[in-house]
From Swiss-Prot:
Reaction(s) catalysed by this chain's protein: ATP + H2O = ADP + phosphate + H(+)
Species in which this protein is naturally found: Escherichia coli (strain K12)
Keyword Heme: no
Name listed for the protein in its UniProt record: ATP-dependent RNA helicase HrpA
GO molecular function, one term: ATP hydrolysis activity
Domain Helicase ATP-binding, first and last residues per copy: 87-250
Enzyme class: hydrolase
Keywords: ATP-binding, Helicase, Hydrolase, Nucleotide-binding
Any Pfam family the entry gives: HA2_C
Organism superkingdom: Bacteria
Length: 1300
């Protein structure tokens, strides 16, 4: 670069100082950019072009200097007297504090002083105001004093209204506007001077600006900062800006008389309210000299209500004017226009320090204001109406001492005033820091903990705010940068001028179509509850409020109350409505406050374009919307207590005043948690925990347990537990684990699906591999060894080496295999040799057969080597239709491969004295198996015989203990259906037959397709009845045994599964068919039976006489069937039997009836002797006799005992009579003999219970029961004699012989 070029660059840079600040920055950046241009000619051309642009920009500065208006200062303002001091302080210091009362002129004159210093030419003089109204009115006033139009030299900018031009030197604006500009202009280069007015209000915006400007000053040494404040602790601002100078401007004031007029002066004056107190104060001031009255009110709605009430008083020559921020410009301007008569101005605290209302001589101060305050208890930013501080009260008082002596009437007592705090808490200390952090993050102002606030908030409160914003999903924390990042939702929340919790509810309500209900509820949560509950009228107030209760939600009680108030307000005058509130125990001012907040909220919602629903919303939708702001206020009820576990393990109970108190639901959310004697949840509602998860995704924690392979899903599944702040909103949910732990899922997929074969798939390699593995596993089960098949780890490694690492489920495998199998279809196929370990012994098929043969039956065998399992060992598979054909004989021999082990186990089960004769047991087992032919005899018969031959020692049957033989050496019987599905299994074949008898019968009936089973038969019309029946079904023959079945009025032919049942049914059925075809012998019996026998039959104690006669007839038929060779199976045989029975039945029945009459007579006599008083020594004997008689003579005993036993029955009764005679003489001997009989009888009962039901009907089995009766005769009536020698030992031997 040449010397000439350097001079050009330097010259241009020097000329930048004459430009406006923003132009200076812009050109400086361009100049430094030009330095990078390498071509000298091109660089020179750019310099020439920039020189022209700099000339134009410099011309703008000259024009601005020329346009600066003539500046004059009103002599009557205190600030004019201090102008020189202020001017010098601003010239010599970067920051100046100007303190003075409202009316001193500092707001309007400071910008003019700055202009006189030459400020506002190269940059704007920014002048902030706390409220839009003040920004506009101050701009108009300064423009008026400078004789210019607003929007020219003096401009202003507020929300939705921008009146700033290129010629503007002083820019009035709200502090919020300046904060918003920081986002685009971090150095505030459009300003050379900034005036922060009304800093004593210490709003959040003001504290933001003061902190930001402190950080900015070192980077902008040219920037002048002027802080104006009422005379309320200006030293604090000075200290904040490194002891900046303070210029005090004393206002010109007159003495003000303070009068205290409390609203309720006496205890019994409870009907007097604030409105009446204002009426009284206005009336009192009307007695004074003429002057305007300023009444401070806490809100817009209260102003309107009071204005309406004052207008109705028709005060003479009095104008009522409201003053608040949301009034139209024309309505606001009326306050500052000249007027005649008296004026009453109703204003919010905007008129306390920000605006000077001209002509005010009197002030009425109710002592309250709506002050935004965050409740850490409720976690909600509220706008309660609360008492103002002493400083604010004095500011209000000062408003009436500007033009003359004034009077301030305070609607509270002097003691109340003196007890109030000296200063109002700055907003930073009484606001929700979540909101502060949200706004700072939105504005990019950095970490709140490091930000230089005038008064820094507590770090714990900062953390509380961060946690709340994270809960609401408004911010995320960047741990590396130690900063917060705004989410898209957080960006929306920052635009809503309400508490973030409530804002979150309203935004969510838009999704659920319940914005109206959300606004009603959130505005109610912003104020103190309008429902009052006076101590002396609790029951009455509760009854009134109960009308609005909702049994599931206290939040909906607000909606119900709102709707009620809306209806009443439409129907009633304002006075009547106020009275209604009083009778309904509703605080009228709080109701109006509620309505006021709702109106403000609705306006903001409208500005944001959020639609408000006109139709009522559903319960679920409303509470999901509310839930988004109360996620840390949910609770789960303890099972055994009326208590809830809340967020972070807090324990709370529903407040007694809640509509949910008596029937608390499982899950609730509450608006606030209040701790008194315990922690109470107030304003509660039932929620479904399922609602929480979708709106708390950023807060939920998921834990997983029991990851496991699921065949049906083809994937690894796990149990998921979802918690929010420690509360299990989902206790146990099955989820796919693939995305959570892919490595583990891949391993489990290979191990379970491929190695273990637990997978539903059609892949050919998989089918072949399972088949090969099953063959090798079968060898292990047969030999009861675990050393043949390679271990699972070997198979896992096989698959692991070949399958892609991306395969973590069946779906992934299918996709991968579809591509891979085209090139290497045998990649995953096993070889049988790789499945068998080296050195494994071969297994003989003869020792471990696959089938068991019994007669013509061929039954499949399976093997299981699972000690402890029900089917451990060998299992015989028996198709259900063959169950009745399978016999138990032979199965005790086991298969050849286990037979030696079985014999050894049996020998070891012998009692030690016997067992010692057969040691060592393995040797004797081998010798036994070498000498016998298996299955020729029952195993124990063969074993006893051979052991006796080898040693001469006899082993009794009771010495063997099958229960000591290991289960795997006992055959398991498994009955299967036609689909080979297990129906039942066990080690007792007879138990299975008994349990499945009904199913076997159904099967037999189902295969009887040639019509063999019939019903409704009255004659033998079916030819020959086969004694057995076979029918082929599938691969085997079904065998059954047909028989006639007695059905009372007819007979049927049915199939039975065994010949024993067939025999019993056939006899009864044949008897019935004979009776159906033979005339009844009753008439003959009546003619031939002697009168004595008739009488005996008629006095039958066992049912009706006709039943007894039928019993005799049946017995007669049985006798004749038996006498003629038993049941017949052909039509011819039945015809011959029919003729013989018809010929002989009458006389046979008469003979039987005579014997029955003798039996009944004996019973009658015995019963007579049993009646009356009983000696206790005879009680047991008599009881035994009654039991014996019950077994001999009963309803149906004639056929039951049979014709052969009728004579014996009479003898047994005669034996009882003999016993009774001896019993009275020697009861002790009777008891001894009775005990012997009981022992035998118990042994018989146990034995009979073990027999199959059908077997119990066989004659040899029945004979044991009669032998016991003969034993009784031998003990108690020996003189009657017995037909054969009898003893208890003979009976036991007979039972043993039958058992085999």
């Amino acid at each position: 670069m040449t010397e000439q070029q350097k001079l050009t660059f330097t010259a241009l840079q020097q000329r930048l100082d004459s430009l406006m600040l923003r132009d200076r920055l812009r050109f400086s950046r361009r100049l430094h950019g030009v330095k990078k241009v390498k071509n000298p000619d091109a660089q020179q051309a750019i310099f020439q072009e920039m020189a022209k642009e700099i000339d134009q920009a410099a011309g703008k500065v000259l024009l601005r200097e020329a346009a600066r208006p003539e500046i004059t200062y009103p002599d009557n303002l205190p600030v004019s007297q201090k102008k020189q001091d202020i001017l010098e302080a601003i010239r010599d210091h970067q920051v100046v504090i100007v303190a003075g009362e409202t009316g001193s002129g500092k707001t309007t004159q400071l910008p003019k002083i700055c202009m006189e210093l030459g400020r506002g030419i190269k940059g704007l003089i920014g002048h902030t105001q706390p409220r839009r109204l003040a920004a506009r009115t101050v701009a108009n006033r300064i423009a008026e004093e400078l004789k210019t139009e607003p929007g020219g030299c003096i401009g202003y900018k507020v929300r939705f209204s921008d009146h700033v031009s290129d010629n503007t030197m002083v820019k009035l604006m709200t502090d919020g506007i300046l904060l918003a500009e920081i986002q685009q202009d971090r150095l505030l280069m459009q300003y050379d001077t900034i005036i922060i007015d009304e800093a004593h209000e210490r709003s959040l915006n003001i504290d933001f600006l003061l902190g930001y400007l402190k950080e900015l000053l070192p980077r902008r040494p040219d920037l002048k900062i002027i802080i104006t404040s009422a005379t309320i602790d200006p030293e604090r601002f000075s200290r904040h800006f490194n002891n900046a100078p303070i210029i005090e401007v004393s206002g010109r004031t007159y003495p003000v008389e303070v009068r205290y007029r409390p609203i309720v002066e006496e205890a019994d004056d409870t009907e007097r309210d604030q409105l009446q107190a204002i009426f009284d104060a206005v009336d009192e001031l009307s007695q004074e000299s003429h002057g305007d009255i300023l009444i401070f009110m806490s809100g817009e709605r209260e102003i309107r209500d009071t204005a309406d009430a004052l207008n109705k008083l028709n005060l003479r020559h009095t104008e009522i004017l409201p003053l608040y921020a949301r009034l139209s410009n024309s309505e606001q301007n009326r306050v500052f226009q000249s007027h005649s008569g008296r004026r009453i101005v109703l204003a919010t605290n905007v008129a306390e320090t920000s605006l000077t209302v001209p002509g005010i001589k009197y002030v009425i101060d109710p002592g309250t204001a709506r002050i935004s305050r965050y409740s850490y208890r409720t976690k909600v930013q509220r706008l309660p109406i609360e008492p103002i501080s002493q400083a604010s009260a004095n500011q209000r008082k000062g408003r009436c001492g500007r033009v003359s002596e004034g009077i301030c009437i305070r609607l509270y007592s002097e003691d109340d005033f003196l007890s109030r705090p000296e200063f109002t808490d700055p907003e930073i200390l009484r606001t929700n820091l979540a909101s502060v952090i949200l706004q700072m993050t939105a504005l990019g102002l950095g970490d709140i903990a490091a930000f230089p606030f005038v008064e820094a908030p507590d770090k714990r409160n900062i953390q509380d705010g961060v946690r709340l914003l994270e809960e609401l999903g408004a911010i995320t924390t960047d741990e590396q940068a130690s900063a917060y990042k705004l989410t898209p939702l957080g960006r929306q929340l920052s635009q809503l001028p309400v508490d973030p919790r409530l804002a979150r509810m309203v935004l969510e309500a838009q999704k659920h179509g319940c914005v109206r209900e959300a606004m009603i509820i959130t505005s109610a949560l912003s104020i103190q509850d309008p429902r009052e509950r006076p101590m002396d009228k609790q029951q009455a107030s509760d009854e009134k409020h109960r009308r609005f209760h909702d049994k599931e939600s206290d939040f909906l009680a607000f909606v119900n109350l709102w709707n009620y108030l809306g209806e009443q307000q439409k129907a009633l005058s304002s006075n009547a409505f106020r009275r209604l509130c009083r009778t309904d125990y509703l605080n009228y001012l709080r109701v109006r406050e509620w309505q006021d907040i709702y109106t403000q909220l609705r306006q903001v919602v409208k500005e944001l374009g959020i639609p408000v629903n006109s139709e009522p919303a559903e319960y679920r939708e409303i509470h999901i919307a509310l839930l988004t702001g109360l996620l840390s206020h949910i609770g789960m009820k303890d099972a055994d207590k009326q208590e809830y576990t809340g967020a972070r393990n807090a324990r709370f109970s529903i407040f007694p005043g809640s509509g949910l108190f008596k029937k608390p639901p499982k899950w609730v959310m509450v608006a606030e948690l209040v701790e008194t004697s315990r922690l109470w949840g107030r304003i509660a509602a039932r929620i479904d925990p399922e609602w929480v998860e979708p709106v708390a995704q950023h807060l939920i924690k998921r834990t997983y347990s029991e990851p496991h392979w699921e065949r049906a899903q083809g994937a690894v599944m796990a149990t998921e537990k979802v918690t929010v702040y420690g509360l299990p909103i989902v206790a146990a949910r099955k989820v796919n684990y693939s995305q959570i732990d892919p490595a583990l899922c891949r391993e489990l997929f290979i191990r379970h699906a491929l190695v273990e074969g637990d997978w539903q798939t059609r892949h050919a390699f998989f089918r072949e591999n399972l088949k090969l593995r099953a063959e090798v596993e079968e060898l292990e089960h047969k030999s009861r060894r675990r050393d043949i098949l390679v271990d699972d780890e070997t198979l896992f490694e096989f698959y692991d080496q070949r399958i892609s690492h991306d395969v973590i489920s069946a779906r992934h495998f299918d996709s991968w295999w579809k591509k891979v199998s085209r090139e290497t279809p045998d990649l995953l196929n096993f070889e049988k040799s790789m499945l068998i370990k080296e050195g494994a012994e071969k297994i003989s098929k003869l020792d471990y057969p696959n089938f068991w043969h019994q007669g013509n039956l061929k039954l499949r065998l399976s093997y299981q080597f699972e000690p402890g399992a029900d089917a451990d060992g060998v299992t015989v598979h028996i198709p259900l239709p063959l169950l009745n054909q399978v016999e138990e004989s032979g199965f005790e021999w086991q298969i050849p491969g286990l037979r030696r082990e079985l014999v050894i186990a049996l020998i070891k089960s012998l009692p030690k004295p016997v067992r010692r004769n057969f040691v060592p047991a393995p040797n004797y087992a081998e010798a036994f198996l070498g000498r016998v032919k298996p299955l020729e005899l029952p195993l124990l018969d063969s074993l006893e015989r051979e052991l006796r031959r080898m040693t001469g020692v006899t082993v009794d049957r009771e010495d063997w203990h099958w229960d000591q033989v290991p289960d795997h050496l006992k055959i398991t019987f498994r009955v299967v259906d036609d689909k080979n599905k297990k129906l039942k299994e066990g080690r007792s074949l007879q138990d299975l037959k008994d349990a499945l008898k009904g199913k076997v019968q159904e099967t037999l009936s189902a295969v009887a397709d040639d019509g063999i089973e019939q019903s409704g038969l009255h004659i033998w019309s079916f030819g020959q009845l086969p004694e057995s029946y076979e029918q082929k079904r599938g691969n085997y023959k079904v065998k059954a045994w047909p028989a006639l079945v007695d059905e009372r009025d007819s007979v049927a032919i049915k199939l039975f599964d065994n010949p024993l049942e067939q025999k019993q049914a056939m006899w009864n059925g044949l008897r019935r068919l004979l009776l159906l075809n033979i005339p009844s012998p009753i008439k003959y019996l009546h003619e031939k039976l002697p009168n004595k026998a008739k009488l005996g039959l008629y006095f039958n104690p066992y049912g009706k006489v006709l039943e007894l006669i039928d019993d005799c007839i049946s017995c007669g038929v049985d006798k004749l069937i038996d006498a003629n060779g038993g049941p017949v199976w052909t039509e011819e045989g039945f015809a011959a039997l029919h003729e013989k029975v018809r010929a002989e039945l009458n006389d046979t029945v008469v003979d039987i009836a005579k014997q029955v009459e003798q039996i009944l007579t004996a019973v009658f006599n015995i019963n007579k002797r049993l009646k009356g008083r009983v000696d206790m020594t005879m009680a047991l004997g008599l009881s035994d006799i009654k039991a014996q008689m019950g077994g001999l003579v009963y309803r149906g005993f004639v056929t039951g005992n049979g014709f052969k036993r009728l004579g014996d029955t009479l003898r047994y009764l005669q034996a009882i009579e003999k016993r009774l005679e001896k019993l009275a003489v020697d009861p002790h001997r009777d008891r001894a003999q009775m005990l012997k009989v009981e022992n035998v009888q118990q042994a018989w009962q146990q034995w009979i219970n073990k027999l199959p039901p059908a077997r119990r009907e066989d004659e040899d089995v029945k004979e044991i029961r009669w032998m016991i009766e003969e034993l009784r005769v031998s003990y108690f009536a020996q003189q009657l004699g017995t037909p054969y020698p009898i003893s208890d030992k003979r009976i036991l031997q007979a039972m043993e012989q039958i058992s085999g």
